[in-house]
Regions:
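Generic recognition of long tandem-repeat/solenoid scaffolds
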Residues: 23, 27-31
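Short, ordered beta-strand-loop transition motifs
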Residues: 21-24, 45-47
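Amphipathic alpha-helical segments
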Residues: 2-23
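Intrinsically disordered, low-complexity regulatory regions enriched in serine/threonine/proline
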Residues: 1-4, 30-256
């Protein structure tokens, strides 16, 4: 563990004690109501830059043990604000040989955690509140990205509001909330993308017989879920969410 990481942990542990996070190496994690929240420090470019990634994951999405350590279904903390004067939109650049630079970088990260991350976590503390919070977050980050590019003299031609409909986190939150309209829209977008990718790979001859079968089964599963959503079959999804939540809680036992 390098000096930057040690100092960062020494700052985080006492300052975030009131929020009841558990630490696993460079990840801080907690479970609140029906969601898991975590954030992780990543070292980049041999210590010349650091990035903090955070996530809110519903327990009704089957949480693997690897998800606990962070970096899965995550967002970059730095994106809460518009970045000026650098193309490193998602990280803090740092001179690892300068103690003054290290301290300033850690102080900036801690300010982002206090001002942006903790208030966000407090609002997104269950599936019911986390889904709209994540949607608003993605839109905000998209606008910040465009503004950062503009400051760098780059025009963003992407026509999107930044909301990721492929995201399983929001899909499972929508199921838990009974928001079948959002869940249906999410699955339909994913099904179309899977069909396109399958047809393109077939045309290029990229798929082995096993890969072809796996892709076809995945598409059939999506279509089955779409049918259940269109029919409003709550019993199917109720059982699915119960099974997933039990699986997540079992995997979370190692830290809680």
């Amino acid at each position: 563990m390098d000096n930057f990481t040690k100092l960062y942990i020494q700052r985080c542990e006492p300052e975030l004690a009131e929020f009841h996070f558990k630490r696993k190496r460079t990840t801080f994690v907690r479970v609140v109501n029906d969601v898991m929240q975590n954030f992780i420090l990543e070292k980049l470019h041999g210590g010349r830059a650091y990035r903090v990634l955070f996530a809110v994951i519903p327990l009704c999405l089957p949480i693997e043990k690897t998800y606990i350590s962070g970096g899965v279904y995550s967002y970059a903390l730095r994106r809460f604000e518009i970045v000026r004067g650098t193309m490193a939109f998602d990280r803090w650049e740092c001179n690892p040989k300068s103690n003054e630079c290290i301290q300033a970088c850690i102080e900036s990260i801690m300010q982002f955690i206090r001002v942006h991350l903790m208030p966000f976590f407090e609002c997104a503390n269950c599936c019911r509140t986390a889904l709209p919070e994540l949607i608003n977050l993605e839109r905000r980050f998209n606008e910040n990205r465009k503004a950062s590019l503009q400051l760098a003299g780059i025009r963003d031609a992407a026509e999107t509001d930044g909301v990721n409909l492929f995201d399983p986190v929001k899909y499972y939150m929508a199921l838990k909330n009974g928001d079948y309209n959002f869940a249906l829209k999410s699955r339909q977008v994913l099904e179309r993308q899977n069909v396109y990718a399958y047809q393109d790979s077939m045309a290029r001859g990229f798929l082995s017989p096993k890969s072809k079968l796996d892709r076809e089964r995945a598409i059939q599963t999506l279509r089955k879920e779409i049918e259940y959503l269109q029919a409003g079959d709550t019993s199917y999804f109720h059982q699915l969410l119960l099974q997933n939540e039990a699986y997540s809680k079992e995997n979370l036992k190692e830290i809680f």
